[in-house]
Design a protein with these regions (language model features):
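A conserved regulatory-domain signal marking ACT and ACT-like small-molecule sensing domains
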Residues: 289-463
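Short hydrophobic alpha-helical runs that function as membrane-insertion/retention elements
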Residues: 222-226, 280-282, 347
Length: 463
């Protein structure tokens, strides 16, 4: 049994869905459970509809709902057989009528609560999974649809719900595992529900997490994350075009990369997979012949020090200075207590005898945090930073990595530098404007030669 997750770009159109059907049909003998994201940018469009409603823009949200229904109907009708068209239209009518009533309620209240965000954003995956199920039947597969809210049970923390693993695993084993023996199972990612049936979501990018949870719950042989890139690369392709494919990487390295911005993987994805020792593959739905990246529980011998360079953008650095800090017991605890109270995670920390510098990416409660910090210290804030993170298990065993970074980046201002507690990463902060040059220089420094067992070199394109 395998779990196959397809992201929004992989199911964004009839053409894309037909491509996915071909990929799944070729693996039908492996008893796939298919997890899909919303079609294209549907989640963003749903949230735009909600915001138009609370702003009182009735004509706008009615038009947006109409356009969204048209898009789903237009693409679905190209991949759904005539015999299922009536059922398709009926289901679309039901879902969009529900959505319209929900949005009208928001317009009356003029308020968008986290619970409402979850209810509205869930429609993307609910629609796409139903359409993909009908499409699979059209292309000759026996396919069954499962509402994820019946099997992925979470707490009540809306927009960032945490799974209730014992209950979820029980339901998955009882429902999905037997179903996968007789049909291709299709379900939406990202969404779940509380035990009493209130819709929740796992956070943006949570479809990867769903796939991992499902894989762990049914004891899958592997979890395949199908994206629009060839796997994990040595650098973000939006920053550096010449990144090489990473053939194999450890769970620990992949988790570090995901946390620090490698968008092909949701940071939490690897946790259930690690616990159940299930390999995860990152594959390209547009180029299914490419082997992608295999993520395994075991460390992978590698001649290169660094496996990949990740970047986390829109970072804010908070610099805290206090002469009273010198030898003061509990000063750091007092600082982190403030960030914890306002539920603001800290990414990096660097300390000296009289100052602490740290970075955050969530600034929604920054003013409140600064107000408390300034009661016992001087605080300066720098915006528009980027965390650049070198990840690789060999970093912990190799002296002089930081020296090589500083030498390679001569002339670029490095604001702070930190080695993670795992010793798998070396991270530092640079200005957004310096990011392309920083990544290019580091890539040249650490990937001029490649271990052929771990990397596939991307040859430069010739005119």
């Amino acid at each position: 049994m395998i779990v196959m997750k397809f992201g929004g770009t992989s199911v964004e159109s009839a053409v894309a869905i037909e491509r996915v059907a071909g990929i799944v049909k070729a693996r039908e003998s492996q008893r796939p459970i298919v997890v899909v994201s919303a079609m294209g940018k549907t989640t963003n469009k749903l949230l735009a509809i909600a915001n138009a409603a609370i702003d009182g823009k009735r004509e706008e949200y009615i038009r947006q709902i109409h356009d969204l229904r048209d898009m789903h109907s237009r693409e679905a009708r190209q991949v759904v057989p005539l015999s299922d068209r009536a059922a398709l239209d009926r289901t679309l009518d039901e879902h969009f009528q529900e959505l319209t009533e929900l949005v009208k309620g928001l317009a009356v209240l003029g308020e968008l609560t986290p619970r409402s965000v979850d209810a509205i954003s869930s429609y993307g995956e609910r629609l796409s999974s139903y359409i993909v199920t009908l499409a699979f039947r059209h292309f000759g597969m026996k396919a069954e649809h499962v509402d994820s809210r019946d099997v992925v049970i979470t707490d009540r923390r809306h927009t960032q719900a945490a799974p209730n693993f014992p209950e979820t695993y029980t339901r998955l084993a009882k429902t999905l595992a037997p179903m996968a023996e007789r049909a291709v199972v299709v379900m939406g990612g990202f969404i779940g529900s509380t035990e009493d049936g209130v819709t929740t979501t796992l956070g943006r990018g949570g479809s990867d997490y769903t796939a991992s949870i499902v894989g762990a719950g049914v004891g899958a042989g592997e979890i395949q994350i199908w994206t629009d890139v060839d796997g994990m690369l040595t650098a973000d392709p939006t920053i550096l075009a010449g990144g090489h494919r990473v053939k194999v990487i450890s769970f620990a390295e992949a988790a570090e990369l995901a946390y620090f911005g490698a968008k092909v993987l949701h940071p939490a994805t690897v946790v259930p997979a690690i616990e159940k020792n299930i390999p995860v593959l990152i594959l390209n739905s547009r180029r299914p012949e490419v082997p992608g990246t295999r993520i395994t529980s075991d460390s992978v011998p590698c001649e290169n020090i660094v496996k990949s360079i990740a970047c986390k953008r829109k970072i804010t650095a908070v610099n805290i200075h206090s002469t009273r800090m010198l030898m003061a017991h509990g000063f750091l605890h007092r600082i982190f207590e403030v960030f914890d109270r306002y539920e603001t995670p800290v990414d990096m920390v660097s300390t000296s005898e009289v100052s602490v510098s740290l970075t955050i990416d969530n600034t929604s409660r920054l003013d409140l945090i600064l107000g408390e910090l300034r009661q016992f210290s001087e605080v300066a804030v720098e915006h528009d930073g980027v965390i650049v993170c070198l990840v690789g298990e060999n970093i912990r065993y190799t002296p002089g990595v930081a020296r090589r970074v500083f030498n390679a980046l001569d002339g670029i201002n490095i604001r702070m530098i930190s080695q993670g507690a795992s010793l798998l990463n070396l991270s530092f902060v640079v200005a957004e404007a310096d990011l392309p040059r920083t990544v290019g220089l580091l890539h040249q420094e650490f990937f001029s030669t490649l271990d052929a067992d771990v990397f596939e070199r991307k040859e430069p394109a010739h005119a």
